[in-house]
Amino acid sequence: EDLKAQMARLNEEISRIKMQKASAPNIRRTKRHHTKTKTPPEYNKALAAYRSRDYDESILLFQNLALSNPPKSLRDNIAFWIGSNYLALEMFDDAILQYETVLNKYPRGNKVHDSRYMLGVSYSKKGETSRAIEVLEGALKRNPTAEVRGKILAQLNIIQ
């Protein structure tokens, strides 16, 4: 009941923000010049192995990439995907360590919110329901993206 009310409130908030954005004057913003680092082919190969469910191969490829001084912008992603491989293999403690690595070593990385969500999923699958709820509720308080927020709420709905 509480989650439904929370989701309804969040959906209203999203609609309000979209309307504000649509009615805002179109101001041209100056682009910051970021040096876009090219994604190493090894990263794409490791991700492809994960997507084709070859988790052991994917872990090996990501670990090798992690040891080869990858671009800084990918280091959190590498740890995240290693964790996702471990989770798929039901190696929950190893997955938890990887997601915690993302949160502790790369607190400003682009995988922080996803890692909090996956950390909660890992605890849930491990059977530590109260810890999973604690992690997921804590993740909600940290302003995740709408997509991740939806996943968190759905996961909380499943385990509560």
Task: Place the predicted regions along the sequence by residue.
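Short solvent-exposed coil/turn linkers within tandem alpha-helical repeat scaffolds
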Residues: 68-74, 104-111, 140-150
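Acidic, proline-/serine-/threonine-rich low-complexity intrinsically disordered segments
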Residues: 1-61, 68
